[in-house]
Amino acid sequence: MPSQFFGLNIGASALSAFQTSVNTAANNVANVQTKGYTRQTANLSATDPIRVYTRYGSVGTGVEVTSVTQERNLYYDEKYWQSNSSRGFFEQKLYYVDQVQTIFRDDEQSQKGFSSIFSQMFKDLDTLKTQGEVKAVRNQFIHQAQSLCTYFNALSKSLTEIQEDTNEEIKASVDNINSIAEKISVLNKQINNIEVRGGHANELRDQRANLIDELSGIADVETKEFEVTNSNGCLLYTSPSPRDMRRS
């Protein structure tokens, strides 16, 4: 037969469990503006019952918090990473397309630009066909041909500068990717050290998700998380250092 304090113990377990739930809710409110924070939930479970009455069977002993887990959906994470990768790709593409368009764009005031120079070149060529004996016409055509050569030289220089800037940006992006990958590798080890013992590394998982968010804005991202076990069913863990990317 349970002691006289049995009911008090049940009440105490309820107070302790719901205090944890309240603390978890307070933590959610406190981090409502924290970038990358994932809402957490205290999971409750009935404690092991005891058998005290032969006729009625077991009786409950209270409640306990079994874990505090994240309310996060991997499906939406993957969709976001895919969309963020596409957005980053097209933003960079648009940036360089705008630069190239600026180089080829005509200046209406100075009448300089790809279309203007070529149009004037062919006009002078047509005039030269009909008035080739006129020295001024010949000089005008020569001058326009020189302007075309000067324009092409300037165009080549500008495109080369864009290419060099692109190469430097690629190098910086590769370095950034390697840096993020190294941080993710460190977090993976820390998460494993906690969760292999049955814990939940919620805050560390948030940090890792933030890094993947950042990484997805630079390159395509695909993540896989799985447990490795040996033939006896024991959990194994291997976390090799990330492979550095190199610009080819």
Residue ranges and their predicted role:
Residues K189-A209:
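Periplasmic/extracytosolic POTRA-like scaffold domains at the N-termini of outer-membrane
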Residues I177-N178, D213-S216:
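Intrinsically disordered, charged and Pro/Gly-enriched terminal/linker segments
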Residues A145-E195:
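Long, non-coiled-coil amphipathic alpha-helical linker/lever segments
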Residues M1-F141, Q146, N153-A154, L159, ...:
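Bacterial Type III/flagellar export signals at protein N-termini
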